[in-house]
Amino acid sequence: MFRTVNGEDYSPAVQQRNILDFGKAHSLLWTDNGSANDRCETGGNCRESGQDRVKRPMNAFIVWSRDQRRKVALENPQMQNSEISKRLGYDWKMLTEAEKQPFFEEAQRLRAMHRDKYPGYKYRPRRKAKEATEIASRRLFSTVQPNAHRGDVVPLPIQGRLRQGHTFTNGKPVKPLTAHEHKQLTPATGASQQLDKPAPQ
């Protein structure tokens, strides 16, 4: 009725093997490529797991900071990553050109290897989600003010980012929207409602 369990069944190595076996047996998305699984679990784009994304070659600072970051983290375990980055940036600036030279040479070698391995490579940075939504909202809520010359486009204040007196048309401040006006503003009716209002003199 009771099963005697061997102490080895709970060792970390056995547990890790059991987890891996379970994952392979029960997951449709499982691949033996660990980096693809890590990307999906850490919020990366899971669609890219089939086609691995090509990383940029490391520059001289990154080559140098790789080992330095490890050293600083071991010496100061309580230090935040952002603080470590600031310290590394300062330390890099303090190095002489002669001290930096081996890292520039290594970066050049890595760039050449990268160019040979990926001849058609072109760096294409991913646009951050927040940045993309801000651009879309600016386009959506931009309108021509009544006193503006034809073609002048002035963005409306969105979420309090523009402060009163800091948006100008023809040298005159544009009246910021009240909370009530902002609620009434929709993409379909925003421009016509705004054109009906005279600008302050």
From Swiss-Prot:
This is Sex-determining region Y protein. GO terms for biological process: cell differentiation; male sex determination; sex differentiation. Disulfide bonds: none annotated. Residues 54-122 bind DNA. Keywords: Acetylation, Activator, Calmodulin-binding, Cytoplasm, Differentiation, DNA-binding, Nucleus, Repressor, Sexual differentiation, Transcription, Transcription regulation. GO terms for molecular function: calmodulin binding; DNA-binding transcription activator activity, RNA polymerase II-specific; RNA polymerase II cis-regulatory region sequence-specific DNA binding. Acetylation of Lys-130 contributes to its nuclear localization and enhances its interaction with KPNB1. Deacetylated by HDAC3. The gene is SRY.
